[in-house]
Amino acid sequence: MKDMGYTKSLIDPTCYWNNSLDIKVVVHVDDLLATGKKKDVENYFRELEKHVLLKWKILAQNDKDVYLGRELSIDGQGFIHTMGNRYVETLLDRAKMTDAKPVATPGVKDGKESDDTPLDADEHKEYRSIVGGLQWLAFDRWDLLFATKELARRLAGPTKEDKKKLKHLLRYLKSTRDLQMKVLPTKTPFHTAKDERRGRFEKKHLTLHVAVDSDWAGCRTTRKSTSGGILDLDDYPLNAWSRTQPVIAQSSAEAEFYAMCSGASEALFLATLLEEMEYSVQVLEWSDSTSGLSQAKRLGASKTMKHVEVKYFHLQQLVAARRLYPRKIAGKENSADLMTKYVDLDILAKLRPTLGLC
């Protein structure tokens, strides 16, 4: 690749690009995915054929192909990738739930009582297998991220209650099997954001929006919180996550601060990659927590944050250096809410389209 004039990324060694041709290439072992103008991409593969034996195909509008087990296609609006209905049917069949009654949400909040009876060996094996399949699916179905994260935390010793939650998620999956991840501009409040440095549409200037949220002490057993986030490049959704925070937050403000730190790390990774490609990048971080935003904008620990580890205050330095701009978003508009807890149907129906799922 280097001999052909392509630059290899330092932060992500799977990425290559050629700025003179405006071609980007992602390498996964012996699978390649290249983007650019049709003629340039064709010339790239023909040149590569001189060095290695390969099969390649140009994906045109309304074409379909498979890359890393995912079905890829392009329509008049955007780029679509999905695991397809067949994968969902396989999971339902494995769980013997092909005839199960569908439900409208991925899960419900824990009740006061739960069945903590451990699963037997066969049930445990089935649980691990299905949850693993759901985790793979969740890369394209961000509405499943929180539920699969919670189920995966119980892989070592699942109970009857965990199996009940798994069945609920599978019933939701049955009712939403046709949802696809479509990479196209989404209707979010981000597009109204003021660019702090230059014109919004200046050539090679991009804005990264990272929306974050947390659910303070959401785990009844450990009292740990969950961080969630979604990363958009301009108005295009690119990444999302749901993670249990590694330490116990002593307040909701602290939990929100940790969520902002996690979101900043995700955004800066992509910003650095884009800057390697000679783009100018601005990072806006959105939170619905006034106290969390206040902690991010100050320098040093407040009276209630003196116990927080030093590494988390790197966020404050990023803000002070204008490497990242904190922004307030209304809680009801925050898509990251879906990554932190089970939500009611009305919230799910409103926010799910902002994830690129349609």
Enumerate the predicted regions with their spans.
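Long, low-complexity, charge-biased intrinsically disordered regions
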Residues: 1-358
